[in-house]
Amino acid sequence: MKIYHYTSIENLALILKHKTIRFSRLDQVDDVEEATYGSGPYNTLLGQYAFVSCWTKEEKENLALWNMYTKYKGIRIGLDEDMFITYPINPNFKTFFNSYIKFENDYFISSINNEAKLIDVNYVTSPEDYIKDIVKEENNMINISPKNIGIYKRKEWDCQKESRFRLIIFPVNPKYVEIIQKRKLDDFSLLTQAMGAFCQSLKESYKISLLYKDMPIKKEALDNIEIMLGPNTSEGERAIVEALLTSFPNHIIKYSYFKGKIRIK
């Protein structure tokens, strides 16, 4: 099944060049409110640990998305839903990452918290009600159930009909764990040494340095890419898109139904 992403021609060029899709940190996306919801006894701001790539399943054109993300001059990308390179943990669970756990400078990524699947956004009256109890403290340890992070938006955003791929990337402030300052922790046996730092970092809403993460996609997904040109796209811009797609022989390019039907003011 194809899913769709409204964006600029420049972003299309970057996707094709690097063969990756960018996941942006939730406090960097258009809905500012999403990243402001606190959770648990320390009011932890979980939005800064969720990274999302935003799509829609709606094949029918969405004028709101054309306007919000392209000002009617960009493109709509259509790619297969299973576009990403993934790694099976079991027959029913694929992840974006090929190691159980990986530490970087001030964060860690766990494969079991990062299922490679498209998640429908839920549009609700009070998103904060679904976030406030994700983080709990028991016996001086932080427990967190991340499944609700980054999937609730206020109902006024319903026009987007959004679905997301999501990464959960947790904080580890290096000042609490000397060993992380010296080398990467890719060995699962070292995980317990970082748990105290993880709990303290969550309590403080420590903001990790990472703003985005680019995830690799399959060559065959790009080989079958569909591009729709925006309602106000010029012939010159079409020529640029055609040049970008010369290496992908099965591509499809078509114009928006609304070309010539919108008076841009």
Q: Predicted regions span which residues?
A:
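Catalytic-core loop-and-flanking beta/alpha module that positions acidic residues
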Residues: 1-265
